């Protein structure tokens, strides 16, 4: 895959400082992150209280908006998928995909939510089975377990990827179709026009960088907690702040090395290795655990997901059956995903050039969702089986005591080769977060520069370091409630970008409508009354419009256009038979514009054979 992308940058010369990054975008975004880190560490518990109050208000009053908004995006994307715009390519019309389907899937998955599945694979189903989301079933009953998996599939299935697919599709379209700079502001060019290069557009790019940094920082924070828990199980490493900060430092350092290597050498290699390792771990659980039960449940899982999704995607707990549950889980997930969706969207757009809109939507929504269902049906059901055979083994530490990061390693204790497999799982988690950080660093650099690989390596390394710094600061201020703090901050940061997504849908549809050519109406054979075998045979033997008697497509004349969009046919045109024209015939095409509605366009009704036209 070539790392050179044909992208037109904004019409600006070098800035006075000689920096490749835009000074406004760079200084505002980095300045905000630095001030946040310093203020968060300095204020400590006061910052924690402030985050909690703001996030609490958003969850209490606007949770319904997140639920309905994400479902609206899903419906919008399905409409685009089924429409004529589905055939449009993310790039020039003759571009081909740069990656095979398997490599494409590995990269978008590893750079997306792969690390999150490692964290929640066991923990989420057991949480929901114990504390039933709708509070209408007995804890750990069969019905409660089914509902638990329905919600888990909902959280990590199509809807999570819907949030990332919208900016990904929008970025891919405007960057590779319209050749605009690789910035989030480019998506809004049909609305803002030239202002994407001035303050309004740059503020959007600042929002994208800040959202990406905080979204990935939350993911890294959760991963660090899980890595620390795994090290505690294996080597009795203390679960304290200084150990977690050391883990962040090491992961960030390795991510800096990877990001300095670029997309092909670093991220692509790590992504492929990581997916292979994750699949190997999944097969280990499948074949060394209750294999038959897991296989049966794997099949059932797709039915559970399909039957529950229409209800869950619109459920907002209006009767307050389980107050606070949806804010803690569903709304947090949507806010978290929205927060880092510019990064995943830009990354997925970068690796999807040459694919059609329909391929993009279908692939980005279906492939990771299918893998997610398989993953949770195996890891989640394995955890449920461990709990059912030994009540309290998982629910007590994971749900009651809140030690969510250790859930996976607690299950691995019940499997053979515990030490080796747990260490193997740790490596997978670490690599997942390395790929997330270096992917985000590359994307942040593109948002800041408006081009790819136009800055020194130190810039991309700096972006990786900012992610580590934010994750570290959030864990420092409240080590005892690290997950809660991470959740609260991401809910606050995500809200502005959530509103931006509604505008993004309008802008994308407007841009596609402006760029796409009209689609011809379907044409069929014209039948006369068929009341004898001879007429049936005669009419059945006629070729369809545009095809010869042998079923081969007839050639189409190549149509050229002048600068005003008028069709230009060089040479003579031979027409056999009568020609009817509705409207006036003019010698000068410019006169046609003055004639207004009296000027008609004669549309070709079918392709003509070479014998029927001469150009």
Swiss-Prot record:
Chief localization class? Answer: membrane
Coiled coil segments of this chain: none
Into which family does the record put it? Answer: Belongs to the BCCT transporter (TC 2.A.15) family.
Q: Where in the cell is it found?
A: Cell membrane
- Report the protein's function: Involved in the uptake of osmoprotectants. Can transport ectoine, proline and glycine betaine. Na(+) is probably the coupling ion.
Q: Which GO terms describe its molecular function?
A: symporter activity
**Highest taxon of source:** Bacteria
Name the GO cellular-component terms: plasma membrane
- Sorted alphabetically, which keywords does the UniProt record give? Amino-acid transport, Cell membrane, Ion transport, Membrane, Sodium, Sodium transport, Stress response, Symport, Transmembrane, Transmembrane helix, Transport
Residue segments, region Disordered: 524-562, 589-615
Thermal dependence of catalysis: Optimum temperature is 25 degrees Celsius (irrespective of the state of osmotic stimulation).
Output the lineage of the source organism: Bacteria, Bacillati, Actinomycetota, Actinomycetes, Mycobacteriales
Q: What is this protein called?
A: Ectoine/glycine betaine/proline transporter EctP
Biased-composition ranges, Basic and acidic residues, are: 526-540, 600-615
